[in-house]
């Protein structure tokens, strides 16, 4: 089973994982800013874009076979869970870990800020009815109505959406995160309703060796709403 990759530019390899409901096309607006310095490798996660459904172990093996020996890895939202798991399990391959409005655990519990699982279920139900309309409304909300021409090339499969929902609801790396010793940064948006800024305060206490960046006027998509700040942060972090 092949994993679909798109490559742009030359330089240090930078692998990008998209979020739930999207595919690697979500990164297209920032590629011109990144490709002068990096070899950008855009990945379609299982069940999204042109990558078929597969379990984690199959995904990891197939992906690592297609990637350079060492690379920086960035994941947005659900993609951050994939990126974190890969960094935990393959520390010799991942040189830098960048988590963009992501969390080691998305669902809230008594001592962890997050979102109620019903939020994702409602989003899933809306996606199942009208994918294009739901994603465009989601983007508009996160960008505070800023214009963004997003074209969905390959809608996610129902299986991909359901599998992603399961990942968001069950994957929990809060304990394993303590194993990570590579340079790691977490980016938060103060207006983000999905990864609340309260998460940042708890993570700063529990994982003091990581770097944390807060985008004061951003919501869940700072790489699109505040691209210049995002690119500056990436260039400062990846040496």
Swiss-Prot record:
Broad class of the protein's primary localization: cytoplasm
Enzyme superclass (EC): hydrolase
Active site: 77, 192, 220
Source domain of life: Bacteria
A GO biological-process term: biotin biosynthetic process
EC number(s) stated in the UniProt entry for this protein: 3.1.1.85
Gene Ontology molecular function, alphabetical: pimelyl-[acyl-carrier protein] methyl ester esterase activity
Pathway(s) this gene product operates in, as recorded in its UniProt entry: Cofactor biosynthesis; biotin biosynthesis
Intracellular or extracellular location(s): Cytoplasm
Purpose of the protein: The physiological role of BioH is to remove the methyl group introduced by BioC when the pimeloyl moiety is complete. It allows to synthesize pimeloyl-ACP via the fatty acid synthetic pathway through the hydrolysis of the ester bonds of pimeloyl-ACP esters.
Similarity comment: family membership: Belongs to the AB hydrolase superfamily. Carboxylesterase BioH family.
Protein known as: Pimeloyl-[acyl-carrier protein] methyl ester esterase
Organism of this sequence: Legionella pneumophila (strain Paris)
